[in-house]
Amino acid sequence: MKIMTRALSIFILFITFALTPTDADEGGVSFWLPGQYGSFAAIAPTSEWSLPMQTYYYSGSAESTRALTRGNLLSFGLDTNFAAQFFVPTYSPDKQILGARPGLSLTLLPGYAETSAKAAAELFPQKQSDSITGFGDLYPTFQLFWNHDMHNWMAYITGNIPVGSYNPNRLSNLGIGHGAVDIGGGYTYMDTKSGWELSATAGFTYNLENSDTQYQSGIDSHLDLGLSRSLTEQFFVGLVGYAYVQLTPDSGQPPALGDFKSRTSAVGPQLGYTFKAGSRSIFLNLRGYGEFSTKHRPEGGDIFITINIPLSRS
């Protein structure tokens, strides 16, 4: 009961933080994908080679009074849908670096995006729509994992290599058009006796300038949370949440947008299942988020379906 009370208290603090007034990234799109980390975020891989995969879908909209820069124009009443399949081949040698197990991965993704908006043209607003199918940017990541009994820690550095489908004159893009560096860490409390687990991952993103638009997004902060309870050895249920807050203003945006700091928060349910495929243990996780307290970016909901396949024996 004490564990559950503490965990619920953390989620209450998260909601309070998310609702605190704070003043966006270019076009309302950030390098960091909020919610990409959930439960068990700081648990080290048990296999030297593995293939985590995430199927992702997001649908959101911005109010007609909320301006975003898309396609080199101010856009209002933006509606957007985005679907992608993330492939994350991961190498984690059974060695120690600073007392931690290392992990190195590269994320690549095919995806689809569609966007419609009322663009502020020279004479009068015009309804425009756009869609794109292609590949996103590449995200290399290096991690270190520590473990002591029920406590687990993780440190990471990742970044964006802007090689994905991108055109500054389009409403829809799969790449973000600029480089970025993100540094952070995570913690997981996992009690195998009681079945309770709590994870938190936090970090900061520094965005490089987009050379096509001379626009530089500000420094971003983000927090991903996961709380779960195992009902059997294979099945668990729980809650997830995220908060995303831009700390410093953009540069290069139209003067009418002001400092254009973005933010969003979300909560939702999750469930997970572990099953055997031959000698391999396959991890499957489904989680969904509903966004609130959003500013200077679309607001909606997203779904993650995660599956982790070990490619070598533990």
Which role fits each region the language model picked out?
Residues 47, 79-87, 129-138, 175-181, ...:
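Residues that define the transmembrane beta-barrel architecture of outer-membrane proteins
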Residues 42, 53, 87-93, 140-146, ...:
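Residues on the lipid-exposed face of transmembrane beta-strands in outer-membrane beta-barrel proteins
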